[in-house]
């Protein structure tokens, strides 16, 4: 089989050449990749072998002003701009596409910068609030510890005061005061003095009952004993006489309450009066 003459003649088909040139120039697709190469250069779409053509400064300024007014490109507006600037409608469309891509990129950059600044501010505020929170928590913990210490001290003081109150002086009915102590001491002294008095009166009692005094008594004790013997003996005889007269009466009451014979009261004091006279 013979190949077609057009394929072996060394000249490619116009459609293939145009696609290759389009892919080489980077304008086959609209995107972020071609925005740097098409900022001020446009490719003529009429012939497959035509080269790039740089836009003039006036054309770029006119396109910028039109883009600032409206970034959307309609067919009537595209044809009018191409006619006014001496460009192809395809050139105007590609320039607007690339310009919108750059505008969106810059807009995203501005939004990102604003959001980044807001994030940094919020992060600083968050850190400050966290530090304040930690400080407040530490202060609350310290206050709770201090309050617990005060409550423990108060409870300890109350518990300490209760035994102190129970250990206080007892009531008057159950305890002893200074007067009671002195009374007890006086009783002890009196109890100590009682045997001495008993010992001193023992010879007298013995003399009164007719018993001889102790062998160890002195001369003074013997004289006092004899004097006391005479005194008690005289009184004892007088009492015996009165008692005999009181009990010898024949009446039931012994004549003590009789109207006819009152008791001779003058006889009680007759002897001392006669002695004094």
Swiss-Prot record:
Q: Where is the composition biased (Gly residues)?
A: 1-13
Keyword DNA-binding belongs to the record = yes
Query: Spans of biased composition, class Polar residues?
Result: 15-24
| Span list, region Leucine-zipper | 106-150
Please give the Pfam families that the UniProt record associates with this protein.
HALZ (PF02183), Homeodomain (PF00046)
Which Gene Ontology cellular component annotation is one that this UniProt entry carries?
A: nucleus
Keyword check for Oxidoreductase: no
Could you provide one GO biological process annotation from this protein's UniProt record? positive regulation of DNA-templated transcription
Instruction: Mark the transmembrane ranges.
Output: none
Residues of the DNA-binding region: 48-107
Extract the CDD domains matched here: homeodomain
- Extract one GO molecular function annotation from the record: sequence-specific DNA binding
| Induction conditions | By gibberellin. Down-regulated in leaves by drought stress.
What keyword terms does UniProt attach to this protein? Activator, DNA-binding, Homeobox, Nucleus, Transcription, Transcription regulation
Instruction: Please give the superkingdom of this protein's source.
Output: Eukaryota
Which residue windows does the record flag with biased composition (Low complexity)? 171-180
Q: Where in the cell is it found?
A: Nucleus
Renumbered to this chain, region (Disordered) spans 1-35, 154-180, 250-277
Please describe the organ and tissue distribution of this protein's expression.
Answer: Expressed in leaf and floral organ primordia, floral meristems, embryonic axis and cells surrounding the vascular bundles. Expressed in the vasculature of roots, stem, leaves and spikelets, and in the vascular bundle of the scutellum in embryos.
PANTHER family found in the cross-reference section: HOMEOBOX-LEUCINE ZIPPER PROTEIN (PTHR24326), HOMEOBOX-LEUCINE ZIPPER PROTEIN ATHB-6 (PTHR24326:SF547)
Give the family this protein belongs to, as stated in its UniProt record. Answer: Belongs to the HD-ZIP homeobox family. Class I subfamily.
Please describe the quaternary structure of this protein: Homodimer. May form a heterodimer with HOX5.
Function, please? Probable transcription activator that binds to the DNA sequence 5'-CAAT[AT]ATTG-3'. May be involved in the regulation of gibberellin signaling.
What protein name applies here?
A: Homeobox-leucine zipper protein HOX4
* Record lineage: Eukaryota, Viridiplantae, Streptophyta, Embryophyta, Tracheophyta
Gene giving rise to this polypeptide = HOX4
């Amino acid at each position: 089989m013979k190949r077609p003459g057009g394929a072996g003649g060394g000249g490619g088909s116009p459609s293939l050449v145009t696609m290759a040139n389009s892919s080489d120039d980077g304008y086959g697709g609209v995107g972020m990749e071609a925005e740097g190469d098409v900022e001020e250069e446009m490719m003529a779409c009429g012939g497959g072998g035509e080269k790039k053509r740089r836009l003039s400064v006036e054309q770029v300024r006119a396109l910028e002003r039109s883009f600032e007014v409206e970034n959307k490109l309609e067919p009537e507006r595209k044809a009018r701009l191409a006619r006014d600037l001496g460009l192809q409608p395809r050139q105007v469309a590609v320039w607007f596409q690339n310009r919108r891509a750059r505008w969106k990129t810059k807009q995203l950059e501005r939004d990102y910068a604003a959001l980044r600044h807001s994030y940094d501010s919020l992060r600083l505020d968050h850190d400050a609030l966290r530090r304040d929170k930690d400080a407040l928590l530490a202060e609350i913990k310290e206050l709770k510890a201090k309050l617990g210490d005060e409550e423990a001290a108060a409870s300890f003081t109350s518990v300490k005061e209760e035994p102190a109150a129970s250990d206080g002086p007892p009531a008057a009915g159950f305890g002893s005061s200074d007067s009671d102590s002195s009374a007890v001491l006086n009783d002890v002294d009196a109890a100590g003095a009682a045997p001495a008095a008993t010992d001193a009166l023992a010879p007298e009692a013995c003399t009164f009952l007719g018993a001889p005094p102790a062998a160890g008594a002195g001369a003074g004790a013997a004289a006092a004993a004899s004097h006391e013997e005479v005194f008690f003996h005289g009184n004892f005889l007088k009492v015996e006489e009165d008692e005999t007269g009181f009990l010898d009466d024949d009446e039931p009451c012994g004549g003590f309450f009789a109207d006819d014979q009152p008791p001779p009261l003058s006889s009680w004091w007759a002897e001392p009066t006669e002695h004094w006279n």
